[in-house]
Amino acid sequence: MAKFEAHLKCSFCGKSQEQVRKLIAGPGVYICDECIDLCNEILDEELLENPSKVKDGNDSKIPTSASTVSKPAPTLSSIPKPIEIKSFLDNQVVGQEDAKKILSVAVYNHYKRLAWQGSETNEIDLHTTKLHKSNILLIGPTGSGKTLLAQTLAELLDVPFAVADATTLTEAGYVGEDVENILLRLLQKSDMDVELAQRGIIYIDEIDKIARKSENPSITRDVSGEGVQQALLKMLEGTIANVPPQGGRKHPYQDSIQIDTSQILFICGGAFVGLEDIVQKRLGRNSIGFMTNDNRGKSRKSNDLPKNQVLNNLEPDDLVRYGLIPEFIGRMPVSAVLEPLDVDALEAILQEPRDAVIKQFITLMSMDNVKLTFEENAIKSIAKEAFRRKTGARALRGIVEELMLELMYKLPSQDEIKNCSVTQAMVEAITGGKIVPLPPSDKRATKESA
């Protein structure tokens, strides 16, 4: 053993143990005190050239809020009022008036709470009262605008925004993603700025897919249902979470970043297919024994409700019957129901929002010096086809992509064509499974397709 120790040497400079004052051993590697001093000099020179790389603490591998210049915390005067928030949402999202009002008030109160904790409110002696955050649950069919609402809010408030898919989450120790990976996405959107991430918004999509399989507590392990709900509880309520910067499963021995989730606004969304039936069943449940005229009238009234209005009578017990645990529902005190989009709403979505699908394609074609127009009847036909496909606003882009394929393929090569009009006949041909060929160029300045 003594013979082996005599031949120890620095893995970097090659000097033996006898030639240096100190030789520090690591897993299969050695470094001497001289190389350590040299490393320190290199780091000091780099920090002098670029002071923004200075980090708090001794561990420079862990990103902290001091690694970049954080945006200032919101102040009461800088937070848009609920009416202003809704007005901004109106520019991006068509319809869903009730949901937009609920979101506007909830988001305003959340960021007012953050500002209340800052210096601007120190003049008001209200700090004896602790304000708790109110996370939001969005319930609505696919393509009704749940994700878009959350994205638009984050854009308005200029805060980091991350989207997570609840279907990929599992309990710790099982194949899948840990719930802490949700926070990692937000941290990455914040350029690893912890302070900025702690004021962000997280949207968890498909939250209805982690409902437990039955109303009763599960006897066996439900690692992607009730187990995930249990794992999310503390994060939703507010806790100091340890987030692995490279993901927890593949790098188990890395250092963690601590994030306080008490200031992060969580918005959960899901389609909750079948929830209407649960509400309808509760509303129309017959009384035991003889029915009075009052009860008979209420039962008849509940059965006459249109399907899109049934969820307006939603109660927490209905969500429990669907499969969410009471503790999870309690941490989502604000809920908003989004209505299914009808043909008129889909028609408006095609044209009115700032980033409407038709506006996008008009811009694309203008880059080829072609003025693109859509006839009114063509727009109505697109909306009707999207309604028939039952995937909400998401169907609109797919239909227009199909419609524009032949035009976008040939028009860039036909410089003489400066105008192009999309007609109802073109839409009906596409929706009927046919492809309308683009006529060969005849040197006209305007081309009408029919």
Curated annotation (Swiss-Prot):
It comes from Prochlorococcus marinus (strain SARG / CCMP1375 / SS120). ATP binds at P141, T142, G143, S144, G145, K146, T147, L148. GO terms for cellular component: HslUV protease complex. SUPFAM superfamilies: Glucocorticoid receptor-like (DNA-binding domain), P-loop containing nucleoside triphosphate hydrolases. GO terms for molecular function: ATP binding; ATP hydrolysis activity; ATP-dependent protein folding chaperone; protein dimerization activity; unfolded protein binding; zinc ion binding. It holds the Pfam family ClpB_D2-small. The keyword Endoplasmic reticulum does not apply. Belongs to the ClpX chaperone family. Keywords: ATP-binding, Chaperone, Metal-binding, Nucleotide-binding, Zinc. NCBIfam families: clpX, PRK05342.1. Component of the ClpX-ClpP complex. Forms a hexameric ring that, in the presence of ATP, binds to fourteen ClpP subunits assembled into a disk-like structure with a central cavity, resembling the structure of eukaryotic proteasomes. ATP-dependent specificity component of the Clp protease. It directs the protease to specific substrates. Can perform chaperone functions in the absence of ClpP. Residues 1-51 form the ClpX-type ZB domain. GO terms for biological process: cell division; proteolysis involved in protein catabolic process. Residues 53-75 are annotated as: Disordered. Residues 61-75 have a biased composition (Polar residues). This is ATP-dependent Clp protease ATP-binding subunit ClpX.
